[in-house]
Amino acid sequence: MAALYACTKCHQRFPFEALSQGQQLCKECRIAHPVVKCTYCRTEYQQESKTNTICKKCAQNVQLYGTPKPCQYCNIIAAFIGNKCQRCTNSEKKYGPPYSCEQCKQQCAFDRKDDRKKVDGKLLCWLCTLSYKRVLQKTKEQRKHLSSSSRAGHQEKEQYSRLSGGGHYNSQKTLSTSSIQNEIPKKKSKFESITTNGDSFSPDLALDSPGTDHFVIIAQLKEEVATLKKMLHQKDQMILEKEKKITELKADFQYQESQMRAKMNQMEKTHKEVTEQLQAKNRELLKQAAALSKSKKSEKSGAITSP
């Protein structure tokens, strides 16, 4: 009897082949609790419900610190404290200021001073490194699947040749040799056409390359789409910030304009009041001057008539 192994989620026992490699989950648990990326920190986690789109750590941080902001380095919406996410904060303390990622061109790649930590000699950020490793893993699985299928087909051909035997052996031998001779130039021409395109593949990889190349191209296109989405999100954030700044400047300008108008109105009112006061004072002085001149004239006329 074959050994049975427990699922890490439902704890029911299944054959080893029925469980997933990483999480050791059965088929039903894999469907009910898929591995998804957190909306905030972009790490993979086991989804408990369809409505839950963030991991447990981010859920706790949301309760403690509120909704996060985009990190000023990696642009991931995971900056709960300050303007940087926890990953970039720790990396900056450990490795110094960030450098430009050679894939997404963002200022979020940290140099660990170790060439073994680089990906094909390139300095990549955390997200681009994960994407590259996923592509390599999928390519490796695809090649393993292709090699196993070709090996199974070869074994079936050998079994068929053993069972056929007898008088058909010589005819099959001549047919097989002629078919092999006919197929060798085709494979050779195929390999030459691949190598002339500038690719340096070995013959074994050249025979298995079409499906693998298509898979790698699809994976690269997906990563490029993700990168473009990230850049688009970054541009949208920049546009929103600029629009916010323009709105603030407009509001400040309107406030200053209203203050200036109020000040001008107040100055005009004050000037009008001062002018009216001066005019009233001037009229009063003119009256006093007229009265003085009149009294002087009367005094002079009285002095003349008195002798």
From Swiss-Prot:
Keyword Coiled coil part of the UniProt annotation: yes
Compositionally biased spans, kind Polar residues: 169-182
Keyword field: Coiled coil
Coiled coil, from the record: 217-299
GO cellular component terms given for this protein: nuclear speck; nucleoplasm
Region listing for Disordered, in residue ranges: 142-195, 287-307
Domain of life: Eukaryota
Family, per entry: Belongs to the FAM76 family.
Name this polypeptide is given: Protein FAM76A
Organism the protein comes from: Homo sapiens (Human)
Gene name, Swiss-Prot/TrEMBL: FAM76A
